[in-house]
Curated annotation (Swiss-Prot):
Source lineage: Eukaryota, Metazoa, Chordata, Craniata, Vertebrata
UniProt source species: Mus musculus (Mouse)
Summary of the function given for this chain in its UniProt record: Component of ribonuclease P, a ribonucleoprotein complex that generates mature tRNA molecules by cleaving their 5'-ends.
Xref: Pfam families: RNase_P-MRP_p29
InterPro entries: RNase_P/MRP_Rpp29-subunit, RNase_P/MRP_Rpp29_sf, Rof/RNase_P-like, Rpp29/RNP1
Origin: domain of life: Eukaryota
Gene symbol of the encoding locus: Pop4
Name of the protein in its database record: Ribonuclease P protein subunit p29
Length: 221
């Protein structure tokens, strides 16, 4: 603290400025006398207390840690942009039934695992409930009823499903777009046949998993 209040001249500084050098004791006595003369109302005890105090740092600068910049989320393409770019279109050279048979085999294994093996004693209602919420891409689907006679009998592997249509590749390598509205479809796997009423099935595949389907006695097209 003493060094913060006063500092003794070096021999060279004293000689350069023509200042008489003081010993440490004389310098300390000078400071005490100066304080007593400058602040006469302060007692000797308070002066000693002030001399013993630590220096107060008026300003203290800390290095601020650089804030991490938020990562920019990659913005994907919108549904309209994907349609405009025709990303969902199946190229003519890829419209071959044999090309998607492995997909059908994968789908059958997926449904067997989903229904715990499709055993003969399995309740049909349970299989129906599972199929309604399952991913149908790769299933062999048939149109059994329709208000448009030309759709009846169309059978093939389901390649794409949207909210309103099924896209099916037939054994003749024809890509058919079948509307769900006013059509009844069947899906068969391991001798189990499930009926799908398209008019009540107008949902995206991702939305069906959370949809609660209610059993009804009869449904018209």
């Amino acid at each position: 603290m003493k060094a913060a209040i006063y500092h003794a001249f070096s021999h060279k500084e004293a000689k350069d400025h023509d200042v008489q050098e003081l010993g440490s004791q004389r310098a300390e006595a000078f400071v005490r006398a100066f304080l007593k003369q400058s602040i006469p109302h302060m007692s000797q005890e308070d002066c000693e207390s002030h001399l013993q105090r630590k220096a107060v740092i008026l300003e203290y600068f800390t290095r601020l840690k650089p804030r991490p910049r938020p990562k920019k989320k990659s913005k994907g393409l919108s549904a309209k942009q994907r349609r405009d770019m025709r990303l969902f279109d199946i190229k003519p050279e890829q419209q071959r039934y044999s090309l998607f048979l492995p997909l059908h085999e994968l789908w059958k294994q997926y449904i067997r695992d989903l229904c715990n093996g499709l055993k003969p004693d399995t309740q049909p209602q349970m299989i129906q409930a599972k199929l309604l919420k399952a991913d149908l891409h790769g299933a062999i689907i048939s149109v059994t009823k329709s208000k448009c006679p030309s759709y009846v009998g169309v059978t093939g592997i389901l390649l794409q499903e949207t909210k309103h249509v099924f896209k099916i590749i037939t054994r003749e390598d024809h890509l058919k777009v079948i509307p769900k509205l006013n059509c009844v479809f069947t899906i068969e796997i391991d001798d189990f046949i499930s009926y799908i009423y398209g008019s009540k099935f107008q949902l995206r595949a991702s939305e069906r998993s959370a949809k609660k389907f209610k059993a009804k006695g009869s449904i018209d097209l």
